[in-house]
């Protein structure tokens, strides 16, 4: 489920203006997308009595998370960095597993998605001259996260 990621205590991020530092961030965010993918799919099973339409929406978001992860991992490879070079944490996934109701899950993951959206917007801005290709990926992810976040208001 988590391979080829190296699970463990994350190392300190290296400077963003280095290839390694950019790789650290791409890896971290790609892994957050992987955790969200699995959490959404598991929520579909855990909360079968969710509001009508929500399970289908979660399935759609899970596929979106996988798409974002693939973009980030492709970029990670393009800059010569490996997924398994640095450890990543399962804290997000474990936190989502602690949610006891569909609403708790939706609120918690929406908050995580909002933090991710803000981070992606900041990376897009910071990287637009240093690395326009990565900046564009983050810009698109931030844009798409808005639709994921809006699900909370739609269903709760």
Question: What are these language model-derived features?
Answer:
Residues 1-156:
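Non-heme di-metal
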């Amino acid at each position: 489920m988590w391979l080829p990621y190296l699970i463990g205590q994350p190392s300190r991020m290296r400077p963003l203006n280095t290839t390694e530092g950019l790789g650290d961030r791409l890896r971290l965010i790609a892994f957050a997308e992987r955790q969200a993918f699995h959490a959404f799919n598991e929520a579909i099973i855990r909360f079968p009595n969710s509001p009508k339409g929500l399970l289908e929406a979660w399935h759609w978001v899970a596929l979106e998370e996988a798409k974002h992860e693939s973009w980030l991992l492709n970029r990670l490879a393009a800059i010569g960095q490996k997924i398994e070079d640095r450890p990543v944490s399962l804290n997000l996934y474990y936190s989502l597993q602690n949610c006891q109701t569909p609403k708790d899950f939706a609120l918690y993951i929406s908050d995580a998605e909002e933090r991710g959206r803000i981070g992606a917007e900041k990376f897009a801005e910071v990287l637009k001259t240093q690395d326009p290709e990565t900046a564009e990926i983050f810009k698109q992810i931030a844009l798409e996260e808005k639709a994921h976040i809006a699900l909370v208001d739609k269903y709760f």
